[in-house]
Amino acid sequence: MAANNSIEWRAVCEKFRLAQELSEIESKKDPENNPFRSKYKARDLLKEIHCSLKKIEIEEQGEAGDEADCESSQTADGEPEDGFEKTFTGDSAAGLRAARLAVLQYHLGVNHIETEELSAGELHLMVCMKLIDKCTTTRENVSLFIHVRNQLGILWAGRDEIEKAQGFLEIAETMYLVYMKEDGQPPLDLQDFFVPEGEELSQQEKIRRFEMAYTHTLYYLAQVYKNLQQYERAAQYCHSTLQRQLEYKQFAPLEWAINAATLSQYYITKTRYMEARHCLAAASVIANLAGEIPSEAAAKESEAESEKREELLQKRAEIARCWIKYCLNLLQDAKKLLEDNIGELDLDRQDELKRARRNEEEEKEKGRKSAILFGSSDTFDSICSLEEKVSSMLPLEFEEARSIFLVGQSYVTQAKEYFAMDGHVTDHIEILQDHSALFKVLAFFEEDLERRCKMHKRRVDMLEPICKDLNAQYYLLICRQLQFELAETYYEMMDLKLAVADKLDQPDVHTIKKFNHLCSSSMKYYQMFLDSTRSPEGKFPEKLEDDLLRPALVAKFRVARLHSKLISSNLATQMENLSLSLESYNFVVQYCEENPEAKNAVETELELSMEMVSLLPLKINRIRSTLASSK
């Protein structure tokens, strides 16, 4: 929109162009010791334009007399004199003058915020808003209306005034929706107010910029709702933002992909696996738009190529980790549905769920078609193709679980390529723990006890070397996690071997030796975990910390059980093992007596410990009597 095509007006437009160039381009080159040099120059130009506008306005209105001093047309905070006491239509001459002044106030506000002068920036933005609020909303000012409220929303969110930010942003959202319903024509962009006649933006570009402003509104609202702990609403707005960014091609591939992968993790917590899978498939496809990963040779020759290689490898590995979590949680949620009260597969429940699933599949597909789907014509097929490689339904039998496991395992391999032990210790171990968890939950679906035991052996093989090599002084928490998991894994293997042995009339020497090895290994790691809680003087804590209370007491309880399970034909050894077992059971009982608040944490273990404390002495005495009579 051009006021006229005079030389004076062209000079104003050129100043505005220079101000934009200084602010958006030249400012990136400013030295560290003067980081806002270009921003300040841009501000001066904007102030000069304000003076020129007042001068043009006076001339256009034919006001005689001495030319008013342009500085007197502003208050101390830069607010123009209030010459608008009634409502104007947005497309009237007065409305356009107000909008043009408001655009300057908007840019001055943003300029002050970018130079960390937040209060001054807020004042300019409020002046901008007051100017356009005097006018009816039309295509001439609707874009500015949304822009200024977006900025005020960001400003107040940065001050942790989340509700205030919410108010500005929700009004911006409503204004967009109302405008699109009642008018819908491409509105003027802020730049259109300061271009010579004939150089206005194209209709297509106006639409693109207007839609981008609204996309920003949705993005900021997603952050606001997240801060207000309205997580479902935040997810909806995040999903809409991502969808619009693709639709209008307003995205950086890696950033978009990471945001989509992050959103998938929210859907996983809500067991909405169809949406989670869609987000992850889209993330993987869009991440590939960032280009090929430069070779190691290219990375060595060029710093830019090295940085690109690092970023691409890292982001793709992060997306792979999100896929791992998807597969793992899908399997674990299925396990929760299918297990009985002792953690085994409930066959009746399995049949019931299979029947129910057949009836639900058709309804789910209908729901899927009404969901917001990502992708444009050139990416949608790729996204759908990737989705088809892994189910979004809870697996109900081994083969279904195995196919999900294999997908998860392939992403484990991909994630470990970047998050290697050398340089990414914590991340690498977390990935290994997820890999172990995948084997653990797959074993639940396996009916053959020997094969199930082999799956747990794979867990031991991947975790044990790490546990041995890791320095507990620097990685105490991780060491404890690994020790406890290894102890549990050997414990599960022991239970499986016990179940296999029970089917035999008389277990052979090899089976007994293997069984005792599993018991001893489990005890070793439980004891390492317990020892890690001791003081430097070797003293066990009188009172366990909350996060250690249940694990430590469970470890003691299981050590007690393991001692009692050791197989030996030597009566003296049997008595020694039972005495050690009794000692550990006694510890659990005594600790809970001295710390009553601990009882709720280990109700089942405490009940069994109390029972064994009364039974084991009888058994020990019988063995002692037998030994005495045999002498």
From Swiss-Prot:
Pfam family, one: KBP_C
Bias (Acidic residues) ranges: 60-70
Entry superkingdom: Eukaryota
Keyword Cytoplasm set for record: yes
Cellular-component GO terms for this entry: cytoskeleton; mitochondrion
An example Gene Ontology biological process: central nervous system projection neuron axonogenesis
Statement: the UniProt record of this protein carries the keyword rRNA processing: no
Subcellular location: Cytoplasm, Cytoskeleton
Keywords recorded for this protein, A-Z: Cytoplasm, Cytoskeleton, Developmental protein, Differentiation, Neurogenesis
Span list, region Disordered: 60-88
Tissue: At 30 hpf, primarily expressed in central and peripheral neurons.
Described function: Activator of KIF1B plus-end-directed microtubule motor activity. Required for organization of axonal microtubules, and axonal outgrowth and maintenance during peripheral and central nervous system development.
Annotated family: Belongs to the KIF-binding protein family.
Protein name, as recorded: KIF-binding protein
Organism: Danio rerio
